[in-house]
Amino acid sequence: MEKQELVKRYIETLISSPINLVGYDNFEEAYHFLYIDSTLPMKAEDLGQKFIDVGTGGGVPGVFLAIEFGASGFLIDSVCKKIEYVKNKCEELKIENLEFLCIRAEELKDKGPYREYFDSAVSRAVSKIATVLELTAPYVKVGGKILLYKGPGYTEELGQSVNAMKELGVKLSEVRKYTIKGKDRFLIVFEKFDKTPEKYPRKVGIPEKRPIR
C-alpha cells in the first residue's frame, strides 16, 4: 500500500474510533493537525533506526513517523484500550515496523533492556518539558535525540527545564518552527550527551507532580 493511502486509511480509523483517541472527527483537520504536524518538522536522521513514542495515545506521532520515514517504532501508553486499538488497526493495515506496550514510562525501566536502547524518543501533548525529559531520556542512547512537539508556550517550559537537562544528561540542540494552517508549532530537539543516572525515571506520578527543578 502506498504511503498516502496508508496515512488516509489510518486517519479514517482514528476519527471513526469508538473510543476517544484524537480530538478530531473531520478528515482534513486530522490530516493537517495529526499527520502533517507529526511529519513536517521531522527528518529521517532524527529518528535513527529505532525510536520510542512515549504517551502515544492514538499512535500520534509514532504511527505516522513509521509510515513516513520507515524507522522502527516502540509505542507506549498507559491506557491499554488505546494501545490495543492502535495495535489492531496497524496489524490490519500491515504496518509492520511497530511494537506496542501498555505501560507507564516510569515502569519501563523494569521491563526488558530498554535503558539507553533507542536512537531517539518522541512525545506529543503529554506534559511539560521537564517531566517528559525525565520520562524519555533514560531510554535514549548517548548521542541520540529527544524530540518534543510544542506550541508557542514552550519558552517558559524550557526555562523551567534547565536543571532537568543537566541532571538527565541532555542539552538543547535546536528549535524548529513551522506552521500548520496558520498556527505556529515548534519541534524542540534535545541531544543526549551523557548517561542518565539510574534513579531516573522516578516512581509513577513523581515526574509529573515534582518535576526536576
Regions found by a protein language model. Name each.
Residues 102-109:
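Conserved SAM/SAH-binding loop
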Residues 119-131, 138, 152:
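A short SAM/SAH-binding and catalytic strip from SAM-dependent methyltransferases
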Residues 140-142:
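Helix-to-beta-strand junctions that scaffold the AdoMet/dcAdoMet cofactor pocket
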Residues 1-48, 52, 81, 87-98:
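Class I SAM-dependent transferase core
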Residues 160-213:
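SAM/dcSAM-binding transferase cores
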Residues 72-77:
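Conserved SAM-binding motif I beta-strand of class I
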Residues 58-70:
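Conserved SAM-binding loop of SAM-dependent methyltransferases across substrates and taxa
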Residues 109-120:
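A short acidic, Gly/Pro-enriched loop at the edge of an enzyme's catalytic core
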